[in-house]
């Protein structure tokens, strides 16, 4: 039958065997993509510098997801946290990728088998002899099995009872490692940044799923509810499944973009709000202040700042700086970070310490303005020299570096001072290698941005899909223009399959 492209899926209506087949094939494609993508990423990933060239700077997408679930070692002899290892075991990055590819192959074969052997006895209604599915019963089975999986993940994998645990870090993404997590059963479990909530919520949701599954297996739906919600129609299943998927996609888009314990910044990069709020800058200043309180010199206090913390406080790591259509990793944008030059402190000739006003997230260009501790403008890089009052030359601004590669170095010539003032707009100053990857100097987003954009977009599309298929199944008789209880001569439209020979006919 000549079906248009948008109606080809009607071939699996009233055909349970082949409906199962196409779903198994879909699983094969998803699993095969995941395994293949993992192998590709492992082929191009450089594990040599986990501090300045982490996975998220290199544009890795599936490696962070494996890592947060407890995979840290490679058969190549490296660990994601740095250093070398001798016995990575079977569940390395390559082991997980291989398992997905093997599983994909098995699903591929199973899909072919079920396509060929579609007319199985199990799909046949013994009362009518026609193919049919007991959808409420199948719903109960799926709910029970997903509940068992959910409970098992929370109770065993996350807690380390039988499994590796998950990636856990401090609030500033400095000490992350895979460790077991105890369930948080108090109110703290509702804090999205508390890892214990992951364990407790999976245990609770899994328990609920098991109980709900058993309920749906043992209790039949009332006839009026069954008919009212069209529980016998496979398109009802499609509609409600799409609802579950788009709801989950909206949720994870939020947890990724705003940050949570499930999306650690060491694996996915910092969030834009950490730049907007000066999150890392405040922690750096707090640590420097603590160092000065211990009678350290300014140079010594800044030298104790971890390079990893300083690197987070750089606008190039803000996922909102990447343009929507700028393909490639962050390293392809501003380059590969090589080292921290140190923290620049600017002073005018009167001795005021000056602070460069930082660039907001959604600006591509921003005026270079230097203010004192009270927020009063003391110097700038003017657009028009004729009207300048606060130019670096007039005010006599100098810059001195503390910590990093330029520790103790100072500059007084205006051209160099202005160069570092422009760079200080972007946060801490780093030396960036743009030659190796031929980086173009234009900021890119991190996998955090890609994931959010992709899931929010598809969630919206799937929302419309849910409405579409839900309306089709609820108002099928209305759309067909036929009363389902009417014995017409030929009930065009009541039957969903084009050319269905089972269409009821009545001799007049």
From Swiss-Prot:
The record's section on Pfam families has: PSII
Could you tell me the superkingdom of the organism this chain comes from?
Eukaryota
Query: Which family is this sequence assigned to?
Result: Belongs to the PsbB/PsbC family. PsbB subfamily.
According to the record's subunit comment, the protein's assembly and interactions are: PSII is composed of 1 copy each of membrane proteins PsbA, PsbB, PsbC, PsbD, PsbE, PsbF, PsbH, PsbI, PsbJ, PsbK, PsbL, PsbM, PsbT, PsbX, PsbY, PsbZ, Psb30/Ycf12, at least 3 peripheral proteins of the oxygen-evolving complex and a large number of cofactors. It forms dimeric complexes.
Q: What InterPro entries has UniProt attached to this entry? A: PS_antenna-like, PS_II_antenna-like_sf, PSII_PsbB
What does the record note about the cofactor?
A: Binds multiple chlorophylls. PSII binds additional chlorophylls, carotenoids and specific lipids.
What's a single GO BP term from this record? photosynthetic electron transport in photosystem II
What keywords does the record list, in alphabetical order?
A: Chlorophyll, Chloroplast, Chromophore, Membrane, Photosynthesis, Photosystem II, Plastid, Thylakoid, Transmembrane, Transmembrane helix
Single GO MF annotation: chlorophyll binding
Any idea what job this protein has? One of the components of the core complex of photosystem II (PSII). It binds chlorophyll and helps catalyze the primary light-induced photochemical processes of PSII. PSII is a light-driven water:plastoquinone oxidoreductase, using light energy to abstract electrons from H(2)O, generating O(2) and a proton gradient subsequently used for ATP formation.
Q: Name one GO cellular component term.
A: photosystem II
What protein name applies here? Photosystem II CP47 reaction center protein
